[in-house]
Curated annotation (Swiss-Prot):
Molecular function via GO: peptidyl-prolyl cis-trans isomerase activity
Signal peptide: 1-25
Full protein name: Peptidyl-prolyl cis-trans isomerase FKBP15-1
Domain of life: Eukaryota
Keyword Endoplasmic reticulum part of the UniProt annotation: yes
Gene: FKBP15-1
GO cellular component: cytosol; endoplasmic reticulum; endoplasmic reticulum lumen; secretory vesicle
The entry's keywords: Endoplasmic reticulum, Isomerase, Rotamase, Signal
Biological process according to GO: chaperone-mediated protein folding
Motif Prevents secretion from ER: where in chain: 150-153
Length: 153
């Protein structure tokens, strides 16, 4: 049987371990639910992304430590896919719904809506929270009215 002093030490140790674990999880930037931050939204929203739309998106993907693992901005070639049909990770299918053409969003995607426990080696480890800076370029081949007017000049 444990003495009350030993029990108090054990409880104190478990409490310290719990606090350190929570502090590390918070510090690491991991999230458990999808977080969508709108960084820029055009004044006029002519086109919004809906399930089944073919959309073009520029993106920069990072890990929580800031390591960039992919960037269409660097390549100058946005990705094109049908929204909401599983052609991309679930965090994108959910995180880009309702975005306006020209809108910039920051998506913090938990592992369960990204690449899961397996990751996408070698650049994305298993269980990784992903951070994407995105810009919706076009919906069904149509750019924003702002982009159209710039091209007409």
């Amino acid at each position: 049987m444990m003495s009350s002093a030993s029990a108090m030490k054990a409880v104190g140790f478990l409490l310290l371990l719990t606090i350190l674990t929570l502090a590390y999880a918070k510090k690491s930037g991991d999230v458990t639910e999808l977080q969508i931050g709108v960084k820029y939204k055009p004044q006029k929203c002519d086109l919004q992304a809906h399930k089944g739309d073919k959309i073009k998106v520029h993106y920069r993907g990072k890990l929580t430590d800031g390591t960039v693992f992919d960037s269409s901005f660097e390549r100058g070639d946005p990705i094109e896919f049908e929204l909401g049909t599983g052609q991309v990770i679930p965090g994108w299918d959910q995180g880009l719904l309702g975005a306006c053409v020209g809108e910039k969003r920051k998506l913090k995607i938990p592992s369960k809506l990204g690449y899961g426990d397996n990751g996408s080696p070698p650049k994305i480890p298993g269980g990784a929270t992903l951070i994407f800076d995105t810009e919706l370029v076009a919906v069904n081949g149509e750019p924003s009215s702002e982009a159209k007017s710039k091209n007409e000049l």
